[in-house]
Amino acid sequence: MGSDSDLPVMEASFEILKKFDIPFEVKVTSAHRTPEATHSFVTDADARGCAAFICAAGMAAHLAGAVSATTLKPVIGVPINGSLDGL
């Protein structure tokens, strides 16, 4: 997720993953504010055997693009409604 404010939108997906016993991690990282941390997290997750990434971010939603630039694994981008309503 791009910020803590994205958490309420993503909680439903966490419940679905739990229901199907799919292991997952939750991490707040920003493609803009913490690009090095984002890169490190994705690289480390790849090394731990992560199968896919679900990236939620509001406003410009560049997180999914930043993650997909770092991995060959599937990346699902979840747009979060921001204060500009997509403008």
Where are these regions (language model features)?
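Alpha-helix C-terminal capping segments
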Residues: 19, 46, 66-74
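Residue-level detector of anion-binding/catalytic polar loops
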Residues: 23, 51, 74
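Short, acidic/small-residue loops that bind anionic groups at enzyme active sites
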Residues: 70-87
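Glycine-rich phosphate/diphosphate-binding loop of Rossmann-like nucleotide-binding domains
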Residues: 1-33
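Short, structured active-site "lid" loops
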Residues: 41-61
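N-terminal beta-loop-helix "entrance" segment that forms/cooperates
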Residues: 25-48
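Short glycine/serine/threonine-rich phosphate/pyrophosphate-binding segments
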Residues: 6-11, 34-37, 57-66, 84-87
